[in-house]
Amino acid sequence: MGEAALAVVKLGGSLLFEDEGSLKEGYVRGFLRELREYLAESNGRVVVVVGGGRYARNYIQLGRRLGVNEGVLDYLGILVSRLNAATMYAAFYNSPPLIPETLLDVHKLLASGLRVVFMGGLQPGQSTTTTAALVAESLNGSLIIATDVEGIYTDDPKRNPAATLMERVSVEELRRMFQREQVAGEYRMIDVLSLNVIQRSKVKVFVLKGDPPGNIFRALRGERVAGTFIEA
């Protein structure tokens, strides 16, 4: 996708968590190692938006059973995503975490000289993918969405072995696929609000398989990686 001066990387929770909810220590170590190598060889800056993952869903499901309303449940998910981001910040910088709570906070942290910002969600009613799209729009950056499949498929590749990877797809085509409920395994990752932001701002978006984490940084370097470009 061309070497990126400023990139936003959305890390899906499926990459960070085991099925039972524990963090994948090996993956986090590998991601941070690749990130350090990328920064050492480039002038790039990166905003890492971390999802809540299984841990957030556990809290949300418990809260729902306890009668908590959906807006408050969203906020619980945001807090968990920020805790995930704080853990990665602490491991990367070995200092108390500075986690943005607004878009302005992101700008301030980058202006202070930080080359990497770690963050979770920003507000209820918004997925962390939408958050990542808004950050990319605000910073005029590119967006990489890292998930557990190689991109967007014609059907769910985990259920349909005949599904094929789409190398390019337009926002309008994705909208039609949403209406047919055929966005292969991506409903949880690319929602309609995210598509609205991508379309209005013409953000460059590439969806790829984030495991191994080297895939993400190969894409940031402009190397060819399997995945899907979303065209506004």
UniProtKB/Swiss-Prot annotation:
Catalytic activity as recorded in UniProt: UMP + ATP = UDP + ADP
NCBIfam families recorded: pyrH_arch
Record: residues binding UMP: 52, 74, 122-128
Lineage summary: Archaea, Thermoproteota, Thermoprotei, Thermofilales, Thermofilaceae
UniProt record similarity statement: Belongs to the UMP kinase family.
Signal sequence annotation: none
Amino-acid positions noted as binding ATP in the UniProt annotation, renumbered to this chain: 13-14, 53, 57, 147, 153, 156
EC class (word): transferase
Regulation of catalytic or functional activity: Inhibited by UTP.
Protein name: Uridylate kinase
